[in-house]
Amino acid sequence: MLMREGQTTVIYRSEYTAPAYWIDTVDLSFDLDPAKTRVLNRMRVRRNPDVPAQPLRLDGEELNLARVLVNGQGTSFKMEGQQLVLENLPEGQDAFDLEIFTTCIPAKNTKLMGLYVSNDSFFTQCEAEGFRRITYFLDRPDVMASYTVTLRAEKARYPVLLSNGNLVEQGNLEDGRHFARWVDPHRKPSYLFALVAGRLVCREQRITSRAGKDHLLQVYVRAGDLDKTEHAMNSLMASVAWDEARFGLPLDLERFMIVATSDFNMGAMENKGLNIFNTKYVLASQATATDTDFANIESVVGHEYFHNWTGNRVTCRDWFQLSLKEGLTVFRDQEFSQDLAGEASARAVKRIEDVRVLRTAQFPEDAGPMAHPVRPDQYLEINNFYTVTVYEKGAEVVRMMQTLVGRAGFAKGMALYFERHDGQAVTCDDFAQAIADANPDSSLSRLLPQFKHWYSQAGTPRMGAIGHYDADAKRYTLTLAQHCAPTPGQPVKLPFVIPVAYGLMAADGRELATGMHVLTSATDTLTFDQIESAPVPSLLRGFSAPVILDTEYSDDQLITLLAHDTDPFNRWEAAQRLALRRAIKLIAEHADMTRAGALLELDTPFLEALRSVLRHPGLDAAFKELVLTLPSETYIAEQLDVVDPQAIHAVREGMRQQIALKLAADWEAAYEAHRDTGAYHPDPVASGQRALAGLALSHLCLAARETGDTVWPGKTYQRFKDASNMTDRFNALSALVSSGHALAEPALARFHALFKDEALVLDKWFALQGGAPDRGGDVLPTVRQLMKHPDFNIRNPNRARSLIFSYCSANPGAFHRTDAAGYVFWSERVIELDAFNPQVAARLARALDR
């Protein structure tokens, strides 16, 4: 969220104090009307005996205050900035009744924070500080209260009335209105409050828990979208079953609801028992969603459901502890998706995909001006801290804990965490302590104070590795060293605890040694005896720590790892290193040339290594697709001291062109072998086959552009027209667009005509064009033209992200134009968005924080 004028108060973690008052119960009554919603808030409040007596300060924003009563009597109050201050309150420790009546205008709430209207339905978003836009309150996560909510609205217009917890009463009122009363049996902070009202339909499923309890699961959507909710429901059922099986955490409500809305700033929100989702993470059908969409829905449904325990039952003491719930829950959703994937190879693919996100999004954040620890020490605006560091790096910190105590030990630690803290608002320290205390003999327990540097220090550590082989003694020594560069406000870094999973490979592919070493000092040396020949070290297997590995592999060593390593992650990593090495060399050679791709030649050993992967009968298609995809332009840029986005783009495109031309026959064979996956199912095996077929098509279209061949573009266009599922259709369309073929234009027009009524599919259509390779500076004019398209609406966050973010944040070669026109466009859009939705504007502003 961009800073408002005059907003300069820095909040410090070290200055945390408990609230001066506790709120035990909240009884909210809403008379819902888009133009004027009335909110009656009755609270049972008591002084906190541990804090010196002081006035009660309640947060509120954009509210019209009508009355304030204490124990049924009028009372004096004053406004200080955005706070309602009450000084004349009953003395002593007895609880008192506080009643506040306010009104607000949901129809004018374009920020989509608090209570707002979308498609003639009411929705809420309260995390982090949205509840204060609904009523005056102690809007902080350590104030946990029991909520009763009564909703009243016009029945014909808003037939469905939902809130947190269990429905206890509903009925008709006069004048065509009706009501519903909801009681949440669990205490919660205000950020987990939610209400929904509107014309919605739902898919229902009754389930029975392991303990024999019955639960009702519901997925609510707009009429017409019900046929796209089956996968979301299946994902929810799988999430409930998995959390109970893996961690012994059952569903604790009679019903659990998901509601989808197309106007949503986030991906989804874990409000207790009433999750509100962006439609992007609920709606899917074979015709409208790709394999990636299906996988994302499974992951996000899991993530929000898992918050029911890690975030809701145990919440954050303050917002500095955000990773307590988010890092842990990202880890849980990653484990869920890996467990559902089943096969070891599919688990490895999921792990590689997660690491790819971390390295292309989080590593740059750690290396830039926005670098901050997983648990920040200060903030100006909390909404700006919903970052890949807090989420994805936070998940890696939790994963290292599991590595250090073992999977069973981690489950024991989770059980102790809930035993100690259920119903409380706690800290990252409390969580780490519980995992360590449950495993007193573990290295985590022994190293806990040092391990917590992962929470307090920003930046990505670099781990150096130097091997030496003594042929006479048959001894191999491996020296490891760690270093972390200064980050803003943290010039000196203390050593981290780095779990290093390793193996030693012989040149013929035999594994000579394997194990786990925990690096705790600046340098450390490992010695291996009876090693018959000079080994190739395979380090940080499975990406056992979120660090950058600095080691001088030869090409032959990398080719050995790519061919033989038993760790799939390091096989993939070897291919990435081979490609990266060539990209960096070519960028240096071609930095002053305008079109590097035309002059570029790749060496035969590299091409043959890729060819052998493509031909390997024992490797999964999904794994091949990952290995054969070059490092992203963003990741390449991170390896360079001087970044020239145009040169990076030209070299990467030139490398793709060479791989397309030199491996053309193999790409044809791969496409023919994987083009038909039978009846559609988004499982890992079939998804991997479609992904490899799509990658093959994109290379065949690239080769055709160079050779003048018309056959493969024609086949691709036919594939686009005939495809029975969105994955194959969109892969074909992407191949035509990314190769710059003339058939891209009719294909884009046909795609729009087919899906003009499907909002999420149109988002793909806009995104594909905003993210297209820039051949001659034509992407920005295309983006400006698309902003005038009748289907473009900048006020819808999904649509704004699809076009503007795809260009500014995901297309560096096109965005960082030498004439700065990309920056002009970016600044115009940030200012335009900030006028009505500061949160989306703040996200866009970060396109330039690297």
Feature locations, PLM:
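Short, hydrophobic/aromatic-enriched beta-strand segments in well-ordered soluble domains
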Residues: 41-45, 60, 94-109, 147-155, ...
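Beta-strand-rich binding/interaction modules
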Residues: 50, 64-71, 444-449, 460-539, ...
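Hydrophobic alpha-helical and helix-loop surface patches within well-folded domains
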Residues: 182, 213-472, 477-478
